[in-house]
């Protein structure tokens, strides 16, 4: 009995020693919400430290209301801080918002400011938008067909070249009009698509500028017919209006409207 008691004591010592050793706990993976909160705090810290990427991201979050309370003023403030550090996406965001006039009131002077800073970094999109700003004018920006054509020329895509042809044919200021050049550019663009309604419209305006109203009328009719194959272009009323002017031997004068 004595030996059994000793054995029992030894067993209990072993059991107790096992219970007293550290117990490894199960690791609970963080929730999606906690991960997002952690990332948000990290972004906020980096933004306050002056990191342009973090400032831009936090600004977008404030504008959209994603992960934070929606606050347009605060969002623009963060994006502006990033833009001042030459963060080109932040600059484009401010420029596009000021140009579009949807989330904030349209301000072409502010849009011009940021697009010009983007131009300094070699951005082609900024040249394209500046072309529209200078061709339309307003909101503190003086309309200038010459500057508009310069910007569209640097952008260099087919749409921009078509806009140059349109300005050459229709600009209200006579010193910027050149019907012959507008015809040449439009015919060149038509080589890629003989039924492009916009290019045909440009060509008709160019013929009218030269005083060749017969060619203008024929070409404008082709443009109107081409619209039927391009239902996404909802401008039939404008096309018909121009046709009537050409039928009355009148050239068309217009600035490029803002998009």
What function would you assign to each model-found segment?
Residues 57-64, 95-100, 129-136, 164-171, ...:
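Hydrophobic face of amphipathic alpha-helices that form TPR/SEL1-like repeat modules
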Residues 48-52, 64-66, 85-88, 100-102, ...:
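Short helix-capping/linker turns of helical repeat alpha-solenoids
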Residues 45-48, 80-84, 116-120, 150-157, ...:
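Conserved structural position within tetratricopeptide repeats
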Residues 64-66, 100-102, 117, 136-138, ...:
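Register position in tetratricopeptide repeats
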Residues 163, 170-180, 189-197, 201-259:
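Terminal, low-structured helical/coil segments at or just beyond the last alpha-helical repeat
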Residues 2, 19-63, 259:
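N-terminal leader/linker segments that initiate helical-solenoid repeat arrays
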